[in-house]
């Protein structure tokens, strides 16, 4: 599994991947993929890093868990492959972008186009057993991704962190808010959005405004 971590990220992750917890995590994930159907495909476990090299990173969007249904998870938070029905949270993300930026609702839910512009679409837990949400939580992934967020905060400047929902907001403790922009709010899930905690946050225009002020190319959402 360690071999799947892209070269551009190895420099800031080499210390944590040598720790006992990561060795235990590797053994757990290897066993799970051998004995059960798991998502995403093993080759896509670190897709969030592979599609967004460290030197191109501008934005971090944090999710919690990969999709646990067949054909959905591809290693990027909130993203689904082309021609796959958009999950409810992704629909609400696109609706907010529509309103915030006056752009058309996209046909595809594949967010690799965002990743290639410098957005890391990171789930706190990078794997899951099929049809069992949260089944790979508390096995070491959270330690790995918390460390990753902390290292990114130290290494980089003027990034935008989009933290949606209570779980994601707790990750702000790993981010230096004096050198990065943290945009936090309700989760885009229908439960949260229908209570008024999602729509109207204007996170996407605020993100672009911050990037522009800091001399970075805006995201084509």
Placement of each model-derived feature along the sequence:
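Generic N-terminal amphipathic, Lys/Arg-enriched alpha-helix
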Residues: 1-13
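Phosphate-/nucleic-acid-contacting segments
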Residues: 197
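A polyanion-binding, active-site-adjacent surface
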Residues: 3, 15-163, 167-170, 175-176, ...
